[in-house]
Amino acid sequence: MIQQESRLKVADNTGAKELLTIRVLGGSGRRYAGLGDVIVATVKDAIPGGNVKKGDVVKAVIVRTRKNTRRTDGSYIKFDENAAVILKNDGDPRGTRIFGPVGRELRDKKFMKIISLAPEVL
């Protein structure tokens, strides 16, 4: 469950290390974001020489959450951290590598490029 002001780890090689959520996209009064949801965030921490700088406003998709996510078969999945992947305007990832596992829910939300780059899909 990601909401406004939530801090997330960045799971790609764009140069950003931490994001702060500004807004959850997908409805005027939407409060929470889960796996596969898109957010608007700002970069709070970045490495020098990266593609994104501290203070940049970016769109990102949630790939891991600490909160349990219920699946259609009745099972639940949760991760050890909250993480996101930074997106371009067309919905493709801005980085060329994804670090760590991602949820299968991204396949249902049509983020196939992230699924193909991820080392593990749970």
UniProtKB/Swiss-Prot annotation:
It holds the Pfam family Ribosomal_L14. GO terms for biological process: translation. GO terms for molecular function: large ribosomal subunit rRNA binding; structural constituent of ribosome. The keyword Nucleotide-binding does not apply. Keywords: Ribonucleoprotein, Ribosomal protein, RNA-binding, rRNA-binding. The keyword Manganese does not apply. Disulfide bonds: none annotated. CDD domains: Ribosomal_uL14 (cd00337). InterPro entries: Ribosomal_uL14, Ribosomal_uL14_bac-type, Ribosomal_uL14_CS, Ribosomal_uL14_sf. One of its GO terms (cellular component) is cytosolic large ribosomal subunit. SMART domains: Ribosomal_L14 (SM01374). Binds to 23S rRNA. Forms part of two intersubunit bridges in the 70S ribosome. Part of the 50S ribosomal subunit. Forms a cluster with proteins L3 and L19. In the 70S ribosome, L14 and L19 interact and together make contacts with the 16S rRNA in bridges B5 and B8. Belongs to the universal ribosomal protein uL14 family. This is Large ribosomal subunit protein uL14. It comes from Leifsonia xyli subsp. xyli (strain CTCB07). The lineage of its organism: Bacteria, Bacillati, Actinomycetota, Actinomycetes, Micrococcales. The gene is rplN.
